[in-house]
Amino acid sequence: ALNWRDGVLKKVWTYDSGATAGKGAYGKGNHSLMTADVDGDGAMELIPGSSTINSDGTFRCATSNTHGDALHVGVLVKGKGISVFMPHESEGGHDAHSADTCAFNFNTSGGSDNGRGVAEWVSASNTTSASCSSNAGSVNCADGKGSAPSAGSNFLIYWDADESRELTGGTSITKSGGGTLLNASGTASCNGTKSTPNLTADILGDWREELILHTTDNTALRIYTTTDVTKRRIYTLMHDPTYRMQVSFEQSSYNQPPHVGFHIGAGMADPPKPDIHVK
């Protein structure tokens, strides 16, 4: 961890999973790193995969699982705080667990490398739990049971008028269960078979997200924005610390779609107002 003060970077702490004090997180990292305030104290914890590191650089908790590729961190079950969803390369299967305690919501194993997966509130039928979707199936994030609407295995975007999130893959936007909302002709996606966008983020500030893709001749970036009018009012997502940090992670490692630190979905409560003051 580094502090930026008066134009100077200063190291605050280093977490070493190879050292005795950090061994609880050894072998449990992903090809990505996310942050979230998992205990509500105003400071961000680190979630590098199957473990959680405290904001002061000490070990917090870990699951019994090890390495995975995809990583999703956000509110996946109503009333349960921040959860983590991971498909697993080492164990196969997938799991969802508490980012605070690392207790499992559900955990499955077996099969081959399960490298791709997505967790999100993608349908009006997601009333109390988001969908956790991967090659191991699409289930409720709360307990791993039932048959949940598919959240796909690629990227996500808030696009139309309702609170459920849409799916992105390649250069298109679709609704879970069918229906194409956008085909961005003349553009291309990134990262080979992963087919991810250059960026998805709420860069214009009305809480729906923009889709940013490069043209097929690599000469320009195109920004696509929704034209749908919505009655739902949410402050700009970039004022949510969890979301803002996860947008930055899209540009590194195995990029994943950003999640907010509160619930957006069917039946949602009005979100909290950000405590932001500009001098």
Report residues per predicted region.
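Beta-propeller-forming repeat regions
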Residues: 1-279
